[in-house]
Amino acid sequence: SEAGEAAVDYLVQELEAAGIEYERHYYELMRSLPVQASVTVKKAGEPDFTVEAIAAVYSGEAHGLTGELVWDEMCTKGQLNGLEQEERFRTFKGKIVLTYDISFLFYYEAARAGALGIVAIWPKDIHHHDTMGGVWGMPGSRDRDLYPYLPYVQILGQDGLKLIEMVKAGAAAVGTEAAKGVEAAMGTVAAKGMAVTAQMDVAMDNRIVRSSMPVATIPGKSESFVLLSGHYDSWYEG
């Protein structure tokens, strides 16, 4: 980003002022930068509301993507066996999935299962930036095409609890109607107006860009060395 290159300019100036030897390496990389994200929640008989959200690195884009919101209850069950995992992902097809699972493996398997999108809950009420890539950084040429680019956002803990309760209430109402033998006559959950629907809007800047990185060298008395590395970028202030 422009801010990232400005940070490199600053570091280079400081290195020069200190008389430290350095090289500024230029390269091209596949950059994924979240731009904007929101989740609008809809349920018959209740006013629509928008949940504050942030997209993850390597999320796909979504523009008015709408689908039934389902709660991934299995994400709270700990380690699952193969059959349990199959049953879990079978329920995701054509749905927007609400979950606490923020792993890349889950994201990848949810995409394979036909999920429309993922709304992940970060347990705390502070935004947590994440990546839906296999590593932090640019994917290798072999990995890049494996990324599903499924629309993915994270929401705050308190909003997640609210959505979980809404989805559970809708599912409980469906169970009651089914017990009365009404389900067959009325059709799907959505037809009864019991389903919670989510609309995902995600804007991303996923493209190849030119970037640079400073590498400073402070020589010692022997060929042995200590490699120090760290982030100089920041999502907000830094």
Where are these regions (language model features)?
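Structured segments of extracytoplasmic/periplasmic soluble domains
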Residues: 10-21, 100, 109, 113, ...
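Noncatalytic luminal/extracellular "stalk/propeptide" segments of secretory-pathway proteins
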Residues: 1-96
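Stable alpha-helical elements in mature extracytoplasmic
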Residues: 3-14, 103-106, 111, 159-163, ...
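Generic beta-strand/beta-sheet core signal
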Residues: 25, 121, 229-231
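Soluble metallo-hydrolase cores and metallopeptidase-like ectodomains found primarily
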Residues: 50-83, 140-179, 185-238
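Molybdopterin (Moco) oxidoreductase catalytic core of the xanthine/aldehyde oxidoreductase family
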Residues: 121-145
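Extracytoplasmic/secreted cell-surface and envelope-processing proteins
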Residues: 8, 32-36, 105-109, 126-135, ...
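A conserved hydrophobic secondary-structure block that centers on an alpha-helix together
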Residues: 74-130
